[in-house]
């Protein structure tokens, strides 16, 4: 299993950002926001070029989560698969989806946010960060979450 937490930290430190769109740009991954119906986002590779598509009908916080999730696929699974899509029911379906979601949570929610608020519930962290509770379940900080 890929260490998604370490991968997210290395990229964030290397490029001095945790913004998934900025990171995608640094990594040569093309991003596009547009209507995708019921699909939240997808990542695909065509002739060695990586593309991330994000549903424009989602709120900005969810778009950022989707961008980070799909970037996780682009950087961690480029040799395993060539197409991933994220739909609301796809969070726990296989190793690659779990790794991509873990990467996204680790990228977008720094450990310091959790450590500075000991005892916060997932609900409270959700209100603080603006990210959904089911997303925050993938964040791991020394046994706190």
Predicted regions mapped to residue ranges:
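Active-site hotspot residues in diverse enzymes, especially metal/ion-binding acidic/histidine motifs
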Residues: 1-145
């Amino acid at each position: 299993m890929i260490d998604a937490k370490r991968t997210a930290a290395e990229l964030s430190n290397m490029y001095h950002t945790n913004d998934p769109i900025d990171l995608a740009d640094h990594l040569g991954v093309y991003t596009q926001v547009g209507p995708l119906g019921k699909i939240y986002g997808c990542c695909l590779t065509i002739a060695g070029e990586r593309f991330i598509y994000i549903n424009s009908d989602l709120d900005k916080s969810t778009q950022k989560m989707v961008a980070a999730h799909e970037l996780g696929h682009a950087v961690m699974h480029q040799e395993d698969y060539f197409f991933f899509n994220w739909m609301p029911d796809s969070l726990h379906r296989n190793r690659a989806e779990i790794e991509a979601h873990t990467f996204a949570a680790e990228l977008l929610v720094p450990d310091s946010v959790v450590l500075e608020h000991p005892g916060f519930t997932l609900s409270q962290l959700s209100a603080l960060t603006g990210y959904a509770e089911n997303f925050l379940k993938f964040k791991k900080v020394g046994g706190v979450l």
